[in-house]
A protein has these predicted regions:
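Short, charged, surface-exposed secondary-structure boundary motifs
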Residues: 141-151
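Conserved SAM-binding loop
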Residues: 116
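Accessory alpha-helical DNA-binding modules that contact the DNA backbone or grooves
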Residues: 154-157, 165-239, 261-262, 268-275, ...
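Noncatalytic, basic helical substrate-engagement surface that gates or grips nucleic-acid strands
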Residues: 1-113, 123-141, 231, 236-251
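Conserved "right-hand" nucleotidyltransferase catalytic core of DNA-directed polymerases
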Residues: 245-247, 251-290
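Conserved active-site carboxylates
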Residues: 160
Length: 290
């Protein structure tokens, strides 16, 4: 079976360890049926997504074979991480985004410096004094100030800006004619730390001329719905789900099964990962979290 996704995950983990040297690592997976709540709000949410290509050099798999291989690789990746001092979380009926948002603000990590590793723009709304986003594709760290500098929008108002613009990757159309530049230029108050709401944007449209502003005023319901789906400031998690996450964080045993990993790598045909620095780091991490 092709193993491009497993290798990619391991290489990103290795790179993060070298760059950040974190005290703890938490990997969050989408829970089974994770999109259910958002699909109840909008049944088209995430419809029509192209499957992620995990094996860049393999072109002879059918769509069904790609899907089977993806599930197999995800299971294998989880097995690898199970041998490491890495916390893995997967909450039924909850998307990974909501769990990550909860982790950023939960008492367990209060006062910690946190780095979210993702290419997803959804996480930019969570940048604050203690939280950075690292984007692997661009190989860059994004801080709160960088968000304001790059988009002209404060993280506090990022979900509102994205609700106006829409998100093609999640199949959520926004107001036609609006992009980050248009939003930042016409609604400059969104660069402030103060939280603004759709009504503030609609009020500002009254003084402006142009079809795009008419479309915005007429399309308020769509923007409100987009906001519900995109905002991560208050994650859609029950008290029980939060308690389950808290329990896992508190009771996790940091262990490292180096020999088992080497056996698995031989079985799966891994040849190019240098484990020496990761072994040193993981051994240190196990001691640190005893």
């Amino acid at each position: 079976d092709p193993i491009g996704g497993i290798k990619g995950s391991m290489k990103i983990l290795q790179k993060m360890i070298r760059m950040i040297q974190p005290s703890q690592i938490v990997i969050v997976w989408d829970g089974p049926n994770g999109s259910r709540k958002r699909k109840q709000i909008n049944s088209n949410y995430k419809e029509g997504r192209a499957p992620i290509r995990l094996n860049r050099n393999v072109n002879n798999l059918t769509d069904d074979e790609q899907m089977i291989n993806k599930v197999w690789q995800q299971g294998k990746t989880i097995e690898y991480f199970n041998q490491m001092p890495v916390i893995q979380l997967c909450v039924p009926e909850i998307e990974a985004d909501d769990v990550i948002s909860y982790l950023i603000n939960c008492s367990h990590y209060e006062g910690w410096q946190k780095v979210i590793v993702s290419n997803d723009k959804d996480f930019l709304q969570l940048c604050d004094d203690f939280t950075l986003v690292y984007r692997p594709v661009k190989d860059e760290f994004v801080s709160r100030n960088k968000v304001i500098e790059e988009y002209g929008i404060h993280p506090t108002n990022m979900a509102l800006a994205r609700a106006l613009i829409g998100d093609n990757s999640d199949n959520l159309p926004g107001i036609r004619g609006l992009g980050f530049k248009t939003v930042a230029k016409n609604f400059p108050f969104l660069a402030e730390e103060k939280t603004y709401y759709l009504q503030h944007v609609v009020d500002a449209c009254e003084e402006k001329k142009g079809k795009v502003f008419e479309r915005l005023v007429e399309g308020q319901d769509r923007v409100k719905e987009n906001y519900k789906l995109m905002q991560l400031y208050s994650p859609t998690m029950s008290i029980q789900s939060k308690q389950k996450v808290d329990w896992n964080l508190t009771n996790f045993k940091h262990e490292f099964s180096y020999i088992d990993i080497l056996k698995m790598m031989r079985q799966d045909g891994f040849g190019e990962l240098n484990w020496s620095d990761m072994k040193i780091y993981f051994d240190k991490m196990v001691k640190l979290n005893k």
